């Protein structure tokens, strides 16, 4: 049984074809610069294996339909293809940013589901239109193959009102659905399940704090296997300091800057989403570059790192208070899985919470879930590699099998 996973962006499209029996990736790729003069398609056969083979094409892709037509050609190519024809695809799983309150779990795509995605375009103006385009392309190119939408916001729909409501006039929520939705939910859900397996506990008995740290960063407080709070809000801008996003700031800064700097609404939005965070403080948004700069004595890089770590530590404390009991703090995503320096600094002086790191275990690289806590640590400190594509594929199968 094969599931094609699609993550469509405004000018890009990521995909993976996964064999669900082995959970192996048959092929994966990324189409970039869709709609530009020259596009790029990087396609990998048997990625991350000894037999990996890469095909790179540079040509115009006028739209998502033409881009995915080329992907289908590669997947079913007589010589290099991984399946004979499209009939070998059981389902298509789509990553969708925002499903609001209406969609609380993964759903088979129909006109109602597409309508909900359209309704939330004002809150997800970059992602929801692109996600919808990916769905419509799949319907055109794979007639008869069911599509399933897996939403970033699903996992956080179990938050209580005290956590998801903003202290604004309640009418704004009632009229416009202004509330915290949370994102990276597919990743948080995947690592929550993996953590329960690793700890040998039933899912509905685990209390954990999950830290998804990449270029985008978010954390979730998980009580009895369900999300009760998260750092991102109505958009992915709220919460932690990120690669180019500011995270939590005083909202009054925005009108102040618009008045004093003459910024438009769009310019203020760009400032906070694309010119802030690590990049805004030190000019770099790749943590590897920041570490290298810190080694050379770059004070701005050190400040950016300190600010990044400090925000994470604060939220661990806040979520610990919200949960009351914590079985594990879980690190995942690019920085969370690979950056032992960030993990060490986050866990430093956290004895009051029963969190202590084993310095040597922390430095070990592995693609498997692992506990890097010291023996005297009362709380497990786990590194759990995320796999959002596999989680989307599994969700698609579960929906269709009922």
UniProtKB/Swiss-Prot annotation:
<feature type="binding site">
    <location>
        <position position="95"/>
    </location>
    <ligand>
        <name>substrate</name>
    </ligand>
</feature>
<feature type="site" description="Transition state stabilizer">
    <location>
        <position position="184"/>
    </location>
</feature>
<feature type="binding site">
    <location>
        <position position="14"/>
    </location>
    <ligand>
        <name>ATP</name>
    </ligand>
</feature>
<dbReference type="GO" id="GO:0008776">
    <property type="term" value="F:acetate kinase activity"/>
</dbReference>
<dbReference type="GO" id="GO:0000287">
    <property type="term" value="F:magnesium ion binding"/>
</dbReference>
<comment type="pathway">
    <text>Metabolic intermediate biosynthesis; acetyl-CoA biosynthesis; acetyl-CoA from acetate: step 1/2.</text>
</comment>
<feature type="site" description="Transition state stabilizer">
    <location>
        <position position="245"/>
    </location>
</feature>
<dbReference type="GO" id="GO:0005524">
    <property type="term" value="F:ATP binding"/>
</dbReference>
<keyword id="KW-0963">Cytoplasm</keyword>
<dbReference type="InterPro" id="IPR000890">
    <property type="entry name" value="Aliphatic_acid_kin_short-chain"/>
</dbReference>
<keyword id="KW-0418">Kinase</keyword>
<keyword id="KW-0460">Magnesium</keyword>
<comment type="subunit">
    <text>Homodimer.</text>
</comment>
<comment type="similarity">
    <text>Belongs to the acetokinase family.</text>
</comment>
<keyword id="KW-0808">Transferase</keyword>
<keyword id="KW-0479">Metal-binding</keyword>
<feature type="binding site">
    <location>
        <begin position="286"/>
        <end position="288"/>
    </location>
    <ligand>
        <name>ATP</name>
    </ligand>
</feature>
<keyword id="KW-0067">ATP-binding</keyword>
<keyword id="KW-0547">Nucleotide-binding</keyword>
<dbReference type="InterPro" id="IPR004372">
    <property type="entry name" value="Ac/propionate_kinase"/>
</dbReference>
<feature type="active site" description="Proton donor/acceptor">
    <location>
        <position position="152"/>
    </location>
</feature>
<dbReference type="GO" id="GO:0005737">
    <property type="term" value="C:cytoplasm"/>
</dbReference>
<dbReference type="GO" id="GO:0006085">
    <property type="term" value="P:acetyl-CoA biosynthetic process"/>
</dbReference>
<protein>
    <recommendedName>
        <fullName>Acetate kinase</fullName>
        <ecNumber>2.7.2.1</ecNumber>
    </recommendedName>
</protein>
<dbReference type="Pfam" id="PF00871">
    <property type="entry name" value="Acetate_kinase"/>
</dbReference>
<dbReference type="InterPro" id="IPR043129">
    <property type="entry name" value="ATPase_NBD"/>
</dbReference>
<dbReference type="GO" id="GO:0006083">
    <property type="term" value="P:acetate metabolic process"/>
</dbReference>
<comment type="function">
    <text>Catalyzes the formation of acetyl phosphate from acetate and ATP. Can also catalyze the reverse reaction.</text>
</comment>
<feature type="binding site">
    <location>
        <position position="388"/>
    </location>
    <ligand>
        <name>Mg(2+)</name>
    </ligand>
</feature>
<dbReference type="InterPro" id="IPR023865">
    <property type="entry name" value="Aliphatic_acid_kinase_CS"/>
</dbReference>
<feature type="binding site">
    <location>
        <position position="7"/>
    </location>
    <ligand>
        <name>Mg(2+)</name>
    </ligand>
</feature>
<feature type="binding site">
    <location>
        <begin position="212"/>
        <end position="216"/>
    </location>
    <ligand>
        <name>ATP</name>
    </ligand>
</feature>
<feature type="binding site">
    <location>
        <begin position="334"/>
        <end position="338"/>
    </location>
    <ligand>
        <name>ATP</name>
    </ligand>
</feature>
């Amino acid at each position: 049984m094969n599931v094609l996973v699609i993550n469509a962006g405004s000018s890009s499209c990521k995909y993976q074809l996964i064999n669900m029996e082995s959970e192996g990736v048959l092929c994966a790729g990324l189409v970039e610069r869709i709609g530009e003069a020259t596009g790029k398609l990087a396609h990998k056969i048997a990625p991350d294996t000894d037999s990996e083979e890469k095909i790179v094409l540079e040509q115009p892709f006028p739209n998502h339909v033409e881009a995915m037509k080329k992907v289908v050609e590669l997947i079913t190519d007589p010589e290099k293809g991984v399946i004979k024809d499209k009939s070998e695809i059981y389902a298509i799983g789509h990553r969708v940013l925002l499903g609001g309150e209406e969609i609380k779990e993964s759903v088979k795509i129909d006109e109602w589901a597409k309508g909900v995605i359209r309704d939330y375009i004002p809150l997800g103006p970059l992602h929801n239109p692109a996600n919808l385009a990916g769905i419509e392309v799949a319907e055109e190119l794979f007639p008869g193959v069911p599509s399933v939408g897996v939403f970033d916001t699903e996992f956080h729909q179990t938050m209580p009102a005290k956590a998801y409501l903003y202290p604004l006039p309640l009418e704004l929520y009632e009229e416009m659905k202004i509330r915290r939705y949370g994102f990276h939910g597919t990743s948080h859900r995947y690592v929550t399940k993996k953590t329960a397996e690793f700890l040998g506990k039933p899912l509905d008995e685990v209390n954990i704090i999950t830290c998804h740290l990449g270029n985008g960063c978010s954390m979730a407080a998980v009580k009895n296997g369900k999300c009760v709070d998260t750092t991102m809000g109505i958009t992915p801008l709220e919460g932690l300091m990120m690669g180019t996003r500011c995270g939590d700031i005083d909202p009054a800064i925005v009108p102040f800057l618009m008045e004093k700097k003459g910024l438009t609404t769009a310019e203020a939005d760009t400032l906070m989403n694309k010119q802030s965070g690590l990049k805004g403080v030190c000019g770099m948004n790749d943590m590897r570059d920041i570490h290298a700069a810190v080694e050379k004595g770059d004070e701005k890089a050190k400040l950016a790192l300190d600010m990044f770590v400090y925000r994470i530590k604060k939220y661990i404390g806040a979520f610990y208070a919200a949960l009351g009991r914590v079985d594990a703090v879980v690190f995942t995503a690019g920085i969370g899985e690979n950056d032992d320096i960030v993990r060490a600094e986050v866990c430093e002086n956290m004895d009051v919470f029963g969190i202590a790191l084993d310095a040597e275990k922390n430095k070990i690289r592995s693609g498997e879930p692992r506990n890097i806590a010291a023996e005297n640590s009362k709380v497990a400190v786990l590194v759990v590699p995320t796999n959002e594509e596999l989680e989307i594929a599994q969700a698609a199968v579960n929906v269709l099998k009922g």
